[in-house]
Amino acid sequence: MSDLKTMMLNFGPQHPAAHGVLRLVLEMDGEIIERADPHIGLLHRGTEKLIEHKTYLQALPYFDRLDYVSPMSQEHAYSLCVEKLLQCEVPIRAKYLRVLFCELTRILNHLLNISSQALDVGAMTPLLWLFEEREKILEFYERASGARFHAAYIRPGGVAADVPEGLIEDIAKFIEQFPQYIDDVDELLTENRIWKQRTVGISEISIKQALDWGFSGPMLRAAGLAWDLRKSQPYEIYDQLDFDIPVGQNGDCYDRYLVRMEEIRQSVSLVKQCIEKIPEGPVKTEDRKISPPPRTEMKRSMEALIHHFKLYSEGYHVPEGEAYAAVEAPKGEFGVYIVSDGTNRPYRCRIRAPGFAHLQALDFMAKGHMLADVAAIIGSLDIVFGEIDR
């Protein structure tokens, strides 16, 4: 029996089911996976180093380019971290707008994940249905910020600008008809025999194992632990909103899918609550050293013009110190740790990407499964290499 050899198989980095540039070296015993070795770094752009040479405002767009399928969540974490260092108050309307767009971002992310995971195991219809809905949300992004993806909308001190007239009403109309599409996908997948055969019991993980690997977000909740930063460590106005935390039982691919489906419904409810409660008022801090003055003021006041020039040429100086801010991003806990040396540039910025912890457990989760299950497992991890490779 000693002459039995395992086979080495390269999965990716051009494989469509690799969800980006993942090179996976699989050690196979026939169809069974003995070892899975992820090779990352093919999308490494040195973001953390680049940020050290930019002002605090110039560093913001880099965060859109990390997890590029849910951009606003990353900006949010960065802005909260800078605001902690500046000890700056954000107007209440800006907080509502932030939460509104972050929940739309969560829907955006889960629509992509569910449809592409279904495509990986052979179901094509959800992709065609859900991408149409994603396009509508991206249109809201564009109307608010001018860009479909790289919005740079949430900024330290508030948001870039107030939403244009009619946008809130259009989001309300969209949110009214949108749940019907989720029900259709639910009908198509949830009790589908083939879908269940491909996902039930695949890569099961317990709460303890999930915590040991550093899981967060839907991956941790699918294992059965109701841990959500929006409830456990509320930020912005989440403590004033009413929502449930969906949890799974078995921590397998199927439970992760169910958790994400329910999270979409909870996000719909949160968006409705934001639209009902959003007050009138300013959308950025009145401190002109942090946020630029309005154009009309600049045309009239020399002081406003100087503030504007200083802000965009030199940027603001952040007090010496360090801060960590984390948000419940669609993929898990997205954290930003900034060390400031009192200048206008961060001394060090560390980014905690949730996908990194999930991918490191791939060997543990894939061991003993079949080759065909790798696509289902990677799809359920919801990984994007912009944030993993940074």
From Swiss-Prot:
InterPro entries assigned to the protein according to its UniProt record, in alphabetical order: NADH_Q_OxRdtase_suD, NADH_UbQ_OxRdtase_49kDa_CS, NDH1_su_D/H, NiFe-Hase_large
Name this polypeptide is given: NADH-quinone oxidoreductase subunit D
Primary location recorded for the protein, binned into one broad class: membrane
UniProt record similarity statement: Belongs to the complex I 49 kDa subunit family.
Topological relation to the membrane, as annotated: Peripheral membrane protein
Ribonucleoprotein is among the record's keywords: no
Organism name: Wolbachia sp. subsp. Brugia malayi (strain TRS)
Keyword Ubl conjugation belongs to the record: no
Gene: nuoD
Family annotation (NCBIfam families): NuoD (TIGR01962), PRK06075.1 (NF004739)
Recorded GO CC terms: plasma membrane
Function per UniProt: NDH-1 shuttles electrons from NADH, via FMN and iron-sulfur (Fe-S) centers, to quinones in the respiratory chain. The immediate electron acceptor for the enzyme in this species is believed to be ubiquinone. Couples the redox reaction to proton translocation (for every two electrons transferred, four hydrogen ions are translocated across the cytoplasmic membrane), and thus conserves the redox energy in a proton gradient.
Subunit structure and binding partners: NDH-1 is composed of 14 different subunits. Subunits NuoB, C, D, E, F, and G constitute the peripheral sector of the complex.
Domain of life: Bacteria
Annotated S-S bridges: none
